[in-house]
Amino acid sequence: LHVVLGLRARYADPFILPIVIVLNGVGLAMIYRIDSDLKYPVGDSQLFWTGLSMLACAVVIYFLRDHRVLRKVTYISLALSLILLVLPLLPIIGQEINGARIWISIAGRTFQPGEVAKITLAIFFAGYLSTHRDLILVAGRRIGPIQLPRFRDLVPVFLAWLASIGVLVFQHDLGSSILFFGLFMAMLYLSTGKTSWLVTGGIGVVAGGFLAYHSISHVHDRIYAWV
């Protein structure tokens, strides 16, 4: 994968891939650690899907010569993301496992469509913010140190943010909700360079987490177990 990046994306950020590899490695180590306590070990399966994902990543990088073509599917990516996030809520194919309704079952096979939504949301955020960056930075009004964009310029991004909140409220998936919101804030910061957005987002995370902890039992149990 590193070789493919060097050949096809030599100007890509050199830190992202090593960080992802380290995080994935830590996850694999933790899974193998608890495998002995599970009736059906999943470490080897996770390792297989890791290898397959790396292969798919290499193929995409090799054949996607110009990443700017993804701007053409900005709104398609948003629509696809919303559809994927709604699928587990459907009564026929949606499945609730361990208190979280994030699975769909088709022909006896279970799958988390939210995993694909993470990719399509990243494509949407990148495409939309790169196109509307100047409007977000310049248009709107300033309140203290924070430059607020016009609401109409952030409507699509706001919809994506609502989708992440919906994941928490309706699917009881705290991890994915935090990841979606973190992705939203990271992309917004990279686009604008405004630290104030990170502060505002951090306040939103703390406030939302506090409310979820006291109002959603599944979230309370997850946080309690982690602490």
Question: Regions from the language model: what does each represent?
Answer:
Residues 1-11, 15-227:
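Hydrophobic alpha-helical transmembrane segments of multi-pass inner membrane proteins, especially
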